[in-house]
Amino acid sequence: RRLPWKHRELLSPARLGTTAHQNLAWGSRSVLNKLSEDTLDVSAVLAQLGRQTRQAFAEQQVEGVSEVLRQVQQISNDLGVQVGELKALLDVNGISLSNGAISLHNNDNTPLRQLGTGSSRLLISGLQKAAARSKVIIVDEAEYGLEPYRITRLLNELGSKETNPTQQVFITTHSPYVLRELQANQLHVIRKPSAVELAFNPDNAGHKVYSLDGGEIQQATLRACAESFFCKRVIVCEGKTEIGLVRGIDLNRQDNNAATVVANGIHCADGGGDSMFARAKVFSSLGYPTAIFKDSDKAPQHEVHTQEAIQSGIAIYEWGDNRATEDAIFVSCPPELIPALLDIAIERKGVDSLESHIRANSNNSIGFSDCYQHFIEGYRPILAKSANKKSWFKDIEPAEKIARHIVGPNYDQFTDALKGPINQLF
């Protein structure tokens, strides 16, 4: 209560909300006042305009007023109220002309308040930065009304790239584009204690802030996996094949009205191959319950990283037995569904390519037609090796199709080589 007004202004945050058109006119709370408070004095001009408006109205003949004046004059005379000659003039106190009546217009005299939402917010952010009175700015839904390329411009204007910022900016967002444009040390995750934590430590009722220090791997994770920062839990998948498998199984569960990982707030992040361990640690350090879903074809090389992740509380789900994801698929697939897998490979690579891949990995002993029409158990490792080395399914779309339309509907027929880790994951 005892703070001087100038000190209150320094503490009071400026808010850039979804509607901010009032800042494009000289209203009482407009940012334009902060740009012009020492130079703009239009009181005399507005008073003169009020008098001119009153005089101009008096010179106009307003239809219907004369009859009303005659009736009022008659009634006042009958009652003995002395009013003299009646006139209908503008009451100077009824003409509301203030600084708020002055607004910005463009070259064709269109008020700038009619700009689109995104354009007006972008302009106002620049005005607020120029005014620089408030050291705190609150931005609600930074992406609202803006194309992605203009989001970058807005964040730059707010100081996202400045090494020595002069203002503190609090941003709420639901856009991965916004996160990708931030520096890693600008991202902070605020969490409230869980019911279990409160039960064991009632005094720990405050929120906890998790932050990043801006390291290279953190910045890379923020840009590569921005969508995952909006979820409740994260599955860091080694690559796109694993992402596709999880998504495909999840879609099949959705098709059958079963619980899905998406409904539980879980998102699959791209681990980027061997970077998956470092990326998982980034999410875990921010308080996200984190798991890694990987294949096992590099188990010896990953052993140290795997143990470190487990000790950090990160769950590990993998096929085991040094199997790649393609191994797990072909080893566990029932024979009658092998052609369906090959059909998906044909869509991506073509029959001729599959023929050469299979012959190259079988010492030219078998070809595509042998596997497609006369499949035997001994062909499984050849198909798995061909699929792995020649990337038959190494993308989200083919792996998702396999999981949704082949594995999911025939789940009970697949062996535990595939089902075991998936059961644990789901």
Locations of the language-model features?
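Short glycine-/polar-rich loops that comprise or flank the Walker A/P-loop
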Residues: 9-13, 133-134, 183-186, 263-264, ...
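Conserved nucleotide-binding/hydrolysis micro-motifs of P-loop NTPases
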Residues: 20-23, 143, 175-178, 194-195, ...
